[in-house]
């Protein structure tokens, strides 16, 4: 059991080290590479265990955007019917 957690920790540490070294060179990235890296980090953030225990601010922002779009929907539909 401990070996499983240790292997996950080592994998996360190695991945973090690689990302940190990649971040240092981020000035040399083209927009496509930045988008791929952003998508990969977003995926890891959504699927990591800590996001279930401690929700991040980005999730609340997404929720507020959803609420704002739903509250604005009747106005848009009303304007479209005119």
From Swiss-Prot:
Question: Biological process (GO) annotations?
Answer: chemical synaptic transmission; response to light stimulus
Q: Which residues form a coiled coil?
A: none
Q: In which tissues is it expressed?
A: Expressed strongly in the head and weakly in the ventral nerve cord. Not detected in the midgut cecum or hindgut. In the cephalic neural complex, specifically localized to cells within the optic lobe, anteromedian protocerebrum, accessory lobe, tritocerebrum, and subesophageal ganglion.
According to the UniProt entry, where is the signal peptide? Answer: 1-26
* Compartment annotation: Secreted
Which Pfam families does the record associate with it?
Answer: Pigment_DH (PF06324)
Where is it found, in Gene Ontology cellular component terms? Answer: extracellular region; synapse
Secreted listed as a keyword: yes
**Which parts of the sequence carry Alanine amide?**
80
InterPro entries, sorted = Pigment_DH
Q: Which UniProt keywords apply?
A: Amidation, Cleavage on pair of basic residues, Hormone, Neurotransmitter, Secreted, Signal
A Gene Ontology molecular-function term? hormone activity
Is Transmembrane there in the keyword field?
no
What's the family?
Answer: Belongs to the arthropod PDH family.
Q: What does this protein do?
A: The pigment-dispersing hormone causes the migration of the distal retinal pigment into the proximal end of the pigment chromatophore cells and thus decreases the amount of light entering the retinulas. May also function as a neurotransmitter and/or neuromodulator.
Protein name as annotated? Pigment-dispersing hormone peptides
Q: State the taxonomy lineage.
A: Eukaryota, Metazoa, Ecdysozoa, Arthropoda, Crustacea
Identify the coding gene.
Answer: PDH
């Amino acid at each position: 059991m401990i070996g499983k957690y240790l292997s996950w920790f080592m994998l996360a540490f190695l991945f973090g080290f690689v990302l940190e070294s990649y971040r240092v060179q981020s000035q040399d990235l083209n927009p496509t590479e930045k988008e791929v890296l952003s998508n990969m980090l977003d995926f890891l953030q959504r699927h990591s265990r800590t996001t279930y225990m401690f929700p991040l601010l980005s999730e609340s922002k997404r929720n507020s955007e959803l609420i704002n779009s739903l509250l604005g929907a009747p106005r848009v539909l009303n304007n479209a019917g005119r």
